[in-house]
Amino acid sequence: MAGMFHLFTHAMFKALLFLGAGCIIHAVHSNEMSTMGGLRKYMPITHITFLIACLAIAGIPPFSGFFSKDEILTACFQFSPVMGWIMTIIAGMTAFYMFRLYYGIFWGTENKELHAAHTPHESPLTMTFPLMFLAAITIVCGWILPFGHFVSANGEAYDIHLNAQVAATSIIVAVIAILLATWMYAREKQPVADMLAARFSTLHRAAYKLSLIHISEPTRLALI
């Protein structure tokens, strides 16, 4: 039931992320995050709703992802403390890479060349209204939906409750991950991540060579 609960809440904030990505691509005529940056002042609605989705998927209360993710983590800790910690660390990694995405698009340094060719702009209401609608659902659906009254496969009522210790641990891990992403990617000049990549260039190149882009990009181009 925890998995089904998370599947439901995940549908809301993940749809919000995908629609937000569509608005961003529509605004800048590019899907390369490396060409973006500083878009928050051009796209305030997309910016705020995208931030809400990132907070939800990171598991920050009171957004819906917090409630459903915590049910999964509680079940994992009940099964095995080792499994619980593994899943908690993975959840922290999710918070980190989502805020890397958020800062890379809406903060950081503006791409002056891209903006000179095409000034970014907020999407029309036909595109931003679904964002606002999904953002509102993302905020409230975690604590107003009656998932605690659902029944399990054997007919017993499913007991949904927050484990205070698990919840506190997951929040601390998520906040640390978000702060780390903020430190590395939110700067408007040279992000800390770029400085670390330059300092450890050999390790950075080795890690980059392991990325799937070297497989996926030639395959995509061959299929076009």
Label for each model-derived stretch:
Residues 59-72, 141-156:
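Membrane-helix interface motif
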Residues 1-34:
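Alpha-helical multi-pass transmembrane bundles of energy-transducing inner-membrane proteins
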Residues 213, 218-224:
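Single conserved hydrophobic/aromatic residue that forms the stacking wall/gate
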Residues 75-80, 156-167:
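Membrane-interface segments at the starts/ends of alpha-helical transmembrane spans
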Residues 26-63, 73, 79-91, 115-140, ...:
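Interfacial and helix-entry/exit segments of alpha-helical transmembrane bundles
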Residues 5, 9, 85-86, 165, ...:
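Alpha-helical transmembrane segments of multi-pass inner-membrane proteins
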Residues 14, 18, 83-119, 170-199:
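Predominantly late transmembrane helices and immediately cytosolic-facing juxtamembrane segments
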Residues 10, 36, 65, 102, ...:
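Divalent metal-coordination and catalytic microenvironments
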